[in-house]
Amino acid sequence: MKKASLESKEAKTKELAELARSHGTKVLYMQAGDTVRSKRAAMRCLYPKASDKAEDVNDLCLVLQFEEGDISALFGGDISTDVEEQLLRRRKWDKVLVFKADHHGSRYANAEALLKCIRPEITVASAGKDNRYGHPSPDAVQRIKESGSRFFCTIEGGRIRVRVIENKLVCETYVK
């Protein structure tokens, strides 16, 4: 059983943090309840709490919610449906305009219950072509589309950018 902690004990993670610091980048460690704010926007950490535990280290990655005015986006990292269910029990949810599909669109994430609750207009999955895991899963993509969300994946679209133009959500893809 692995426990969430603010600072990773993984050598590669420590090395990456030191490299970032050496280039003048401020490294932040977040847990549920922490918020980073700018003048117009906020990024809130929803999960994990420092006391959370999980068998799979993926279930301890950050879940973040971005908000700017009426725009909200949910970034669930590599969490599974187990963590999605915890999040549904822990808080009241409002509609999320943009959802970064959990675990690259894995069949073990992006549960129907979560999608019904957050009702995303746009869902984006990040996955490499011909990846060994088969992400995004056809089952997950079907659940996402059946929820009424428009679905975009980096496999087809390359880099994906979501913006608000004249009060409308616009998703742009770039393939070289």
Task: Please identify what each model-predicted range represents.
Residues 1-176:
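Non-globular, low-confidence helical/coil segments that flank catalytic cores
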